[in-house]
């Protein structure tokens, strides 16, 4: 082989390899379901996760899927029968805001890996690369009916990195826990945390206006990066052979994924005015916020959230632990839910390894507070706050989050009404 041919071969290899990198999706889920049982659940009271309640209803499960729901379903000979008389059946609970795995138990510094607090923007880090697969908290969450959860980086940074949705089962690798085909998320944070962390070091951001500038600078960079990618991909094969593909940038890849609609934005934010600012920034750069997390003041802008299709992922009654968390009302979740004639999206989240064990009770507290405030909300609707709504916010509603024929049999049988 002549030197010129070697050079041509090498350049062609580099061009094709770089392009493949840009199109690759590393760390794919390798989840394999447990051996499936054939099960018929009979005579159950059901909250289906889509706002409906049924009595004396059967659920037929085969090959890990729901295959039939109805009254008096015939019992196939080789099916295990679970008599749910006096019991309740719901979809598996989903926690949209968890730090299990990245802050595992016991809580020691050597395995506390949720915040890469070395730069205000760390879009290049992925929470799944910090998760400890042996965290004993997973099993405790399972006793509370949690079948899937969404793990986020912490809130020290303006842009903290990618989140991941996982099945609640213990495996030896994180890829084998990852929920198949679930999109990545991007954790963003506004308010006190980023400006405190970096302001205390004498660097930006140290103010809320510094926060806003930091987001905007990052999105401007991401727009430029994405523009270069698009321009390169639109070139002819002959033109591509004459120049290098844009250099990979892990931080920009994540932000470009948001701009392309492939990565879902989950935004830590407490104050109503800051949530409104974040909505304005999202519109400036043409990306969508999927959910605001914590949102103690979400009730003030509930209609704005509904108008923009943004969920409020909220606590039932945790407030007052810092200044931006003071102005809370216990009907917060109910107000977000009932915005714009009931078109709002409310989610009860935990952010806590104890709270994740009791999300049904947290939802019950929120339901009671809403009723005291005068809202006529059914228990069947409140079940959406911990099932179908978080499933939608995690991008997995097509697979789980409600009891529908064809969906995964992520099912909880409760000894009593979960509320």
Question: What kind of feature is each model-predicted range?
Answer:
Residues 100-103, 133, 156-159, 272-276, ...:
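Active-site environment of divalent metal-dependent phosphoester hydrolases
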Residues 30, 35, 105-106, 112-118, ...:
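His/Asp/Glu-enriched, well-ordered alpha-helical/loop segment
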Residues 137, 142-293:
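Polyanionic/metal-chelating signatures
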């Amino acid at each position: 082989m002549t030197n010129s041919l070697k050079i041509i071969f090498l350049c062609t290899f580099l061009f094709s390899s770089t392009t493949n990198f840009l199109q690759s999706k590393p760390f794919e889920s390798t989840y394999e379901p447990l051996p499936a049982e054939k099960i018929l659940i009979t005579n159950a009271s059901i909250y289906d996760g889509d706002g409906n309640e049924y009595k004396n209803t059967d659920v037929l499960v085969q090959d890990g899927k729901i295959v039939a729901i109805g009254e008096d379903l015939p019992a196939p000979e080789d099916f295990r029968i679970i008599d749910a008389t006096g019991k309740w059946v719901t979809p598996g609970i989903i926690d949209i805001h968890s730090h299990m795995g990245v802050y595992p138990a016991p809580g020691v510094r050597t395995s506390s890996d949720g915040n890469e607090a070395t730069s205000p923007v760390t879009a290049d880090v992925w929470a799944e690369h910090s998760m400890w697969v042996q965290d004993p908290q997973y099993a405790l969450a399972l006793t509370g009916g949690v079948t899937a959860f969404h793990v986020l980086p912490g809130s020290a940074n303006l842009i903290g990195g990618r989140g991941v949705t996982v099945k609640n089962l213990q495996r030896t690798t994180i890829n084998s826990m990852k929920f198949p085909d679930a999109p990545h998320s991007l954790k963003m944070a506004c308010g006190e945390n980023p400006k405190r962390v970096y302001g205390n070091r004498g660097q930006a951001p140290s103010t809320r206006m510094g926060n806003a500038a930091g987001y905007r600078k990052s999105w401007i960079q991401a727009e430029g990066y994405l523009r270069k990618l698009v321009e390169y991909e639109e070139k002819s094969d002959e033109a591509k052979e004459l120049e290098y593909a844009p250099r990979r940038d892990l931080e920009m890849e994540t932000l470009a994924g948001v701009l392309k609609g492939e990565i879902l934005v989950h935004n830590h934010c407490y104050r109503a005015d800051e949530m409104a600012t974040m909505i304005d920034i999202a519109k400036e750069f043409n990306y969508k916020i999927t959910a605001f997390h914590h949102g103690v003041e979400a009730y003030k802008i509930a209609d704005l959230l509904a108008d923009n299709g943004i969920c409020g992922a909220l606590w039932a009654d945790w407030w007052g632990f810092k200044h931006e968390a003071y102005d809370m009302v216990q009907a917060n979740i109910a107000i977000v839910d009932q915005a714009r004639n009931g078109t709002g999206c409310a989610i009860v989240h935990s952010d806590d390894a104890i709270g994740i064990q009791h999300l049904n009770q947290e939802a019950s507290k929120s339901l009671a507070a809403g009723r005291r405030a005068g809202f006529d909300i059914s228990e069947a609707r409140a079940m959406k706050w911990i099932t179908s709504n978080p499933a939608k916010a995690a991008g997995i509603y097509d697979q789980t989050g409600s009891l529908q024929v064809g969906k995964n049999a992520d099912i909880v049988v409760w000894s009593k009404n979960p509320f």
